[in-house]
């Protein structure tokens, strides 16, 4: 019996929304998306479908109401052809993506945005649960490890994990047949280009 192995090679350091870094990611085999930035999440989402580089996006949130924790949630979602993307699941905030892609000068000049991004706190136990689920999903997709779910929701208050189906919207600009799907370099990625000062 042959055994399939998983090997990790290389290191890319930088902001994934920078054009040069994003270009390097198009040649990878797989991406784990662990970010608090909407812009980087939007970039990885589109890159996964446009360049056919599967990815797993994961996120956590703690909602506080009246000074008390109302919910503790996590989400793990595979981004690959025939699976709905973050746009299909309304998982991206277009205004936040726009704001994060602006330069500091553009943000100061924009009359529509007054507030900076509010990062979610990193909570190790919650991050650990979501990361473990992401690794299990990866193993089930690429090895003989059992598991069929390609989207999971974690409820930290109830201590439960439930699978969810995320169908691809036929008219989706990212994963739909008339969108970025398999377009490779013939479509632009939502990247930040280096600004040259004159």
What spans do the regions from the language model cover?
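Rossmann-fold cofactor-recognition segment
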Residues: 6-12
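Glycine-rich phosphate-binding loop and adjoining beta1-alpha1-beta2 segment
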Residues: 1-5
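Glycine-rich phosphate/adenylate-binding loop
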Residues: 20-198
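Conserved SAM/SAH-binding loop
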Residues: 12-20
